[in-house]
């Protein structure tokens, strides 16, 4: 009953946004706000050359993976993941597009993807009923564990339950479907999000264990969307000496390149690697591995790049 009443109250809320907006200049779009793995780049404790330049020059840092759906006409945006860099990511959107936070979709309960919601609490923003969209285990985790449950109790956030594979109409121009994937689900399940706007469609999937561990083919989602932002955490298994890579499984870039080598060029061009670990050579603009990925017809997500709307 709690799920139902919460969902009904949110459905009443979204009808406030059911007007029609005409004109390309008013078209909503998706923007990349971060491309790094949970710890960002540079990452805490890193003294290696991969982080050295970023420590010396903050302009070279990469925020944690996050995308936003921006509606410039209605002056609203929705975040996909709440990262440690959420204050900077929110400030960027506010200054550049004069838009306000309308909701957050959380993929899972790993530190880089949900802990940013702490900034909505009374110690910081003190927001009122910001919609936060989650799958069932994530819902349970947030309402039963502090400090997150305080955000719910004080009504800083309003948890909106989602069901995997069931599209949720956020407004008449914007639909989101949670797609559950296999990952290290210690505290919650893990989701990717399928976004459908009135002009373009997108798939945001920053974390998955391995493509072959999923009972679905990722290629089907690439085919049915215009842009896919996919897990590119590690380039190869040798990237972090001394770490057991089986404890932190992700599809290596080299595995993805091999899997997709025979895809049509138009399909390859939809793929944008995101969620890059600070050690990933794809973060280095002149690295030959980065050039090889681009030469293969695939892309590497870039902070500040917008997709759809008026380019």
Tell me the role of every PLM-derived stretch.
Residues 105, 130-139, 229, 272-274:
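Short internal beta-strands
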Residues 24-93, 159-221, 305-311:
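Core dinuclear metal-dependent hydrolase active-site scaffold
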Residues 6-19:
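Bacterial N-terminal signal peptides
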Residues 196-201, 208-306:
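Cap/insert and terminal regions of metallo-dependent hydrolase folds
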Residues 1-5:
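Positively charged n-region of N-terminal signal peptides that target proteins for export
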Residues 26, 128, 152-158, 171-174, ...:
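A short helix-to-beta-strand connector/capping loop
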Residues 71-133, 224-226:
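Active-site metal-binding motif and surrounding structural segment of the metallo-beta-lactamase
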Residues 137-147:
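A short, active-site helix/loop in glycosyltransferases that binds the activated sugar's phosphate group
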């Amino acid at each position: 009953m709690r799920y139902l009443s919460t969902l009904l109250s949110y459905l009443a809320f979204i009808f406030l946004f059911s007007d029609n907006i005409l004109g390309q200049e008013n078209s909503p779009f998706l923007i990349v706000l971060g491309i790094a793995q949970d710890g960002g780049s540079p990452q805490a404790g890193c003294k290696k050359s991969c982080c050295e330049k970023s420590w010396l020059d903050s302009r070279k840092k990469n925020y944690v993976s996050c995308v936003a759906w921006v509606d410039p006409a209605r002056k609203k945006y929705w975040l996909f993941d709440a990262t440690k860099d959420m204050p900077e990511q929110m400030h960027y959107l506010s200054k550049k597009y004069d838009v306000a936070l309308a909701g957050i979709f959380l993929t899972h309960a790993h530190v880089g993807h949900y802990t940013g919601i702490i900034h909505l609490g009374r110690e910081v923003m003190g927001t009122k009923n910001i919609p936060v969209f989650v799958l069932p285990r994530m819902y349970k985790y947030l309402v039963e564990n502090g400090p997150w449950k305080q955000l719910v109790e004080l009504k800083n956030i309003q948890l909106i339950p989602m069901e995997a594979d069931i599209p949720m109409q956020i407004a008449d121009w914007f639909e989101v479907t949670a797609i559950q994937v296999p990952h290290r689900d210690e505290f919650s399940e893990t989701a990717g999000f399928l976004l459908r706007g009135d002009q373009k469609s997108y798939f945001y999937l920053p974390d998955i264990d391995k493509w072959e561990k999923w009972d679905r083919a990722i290629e089907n989602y690439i085919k049915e969307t215009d842009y896919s932002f996919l897990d590119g955490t590690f380039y190869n298994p040798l990237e972090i000496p001394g770490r057991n890579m089986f404890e932190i499984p992700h599809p290596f870039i080299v595995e993805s390149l091999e899997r997709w080598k025979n895809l049509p060029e138009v399909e390859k061009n939809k793929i944008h690697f995101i969620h890059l670990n600070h050690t990933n050579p794809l973060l280095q603009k002149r690295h030959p591995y980065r050039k090889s990925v681009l030469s293969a017809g695939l892309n590497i997500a870039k902070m500040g790049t917008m997709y759809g709307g008026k380019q």
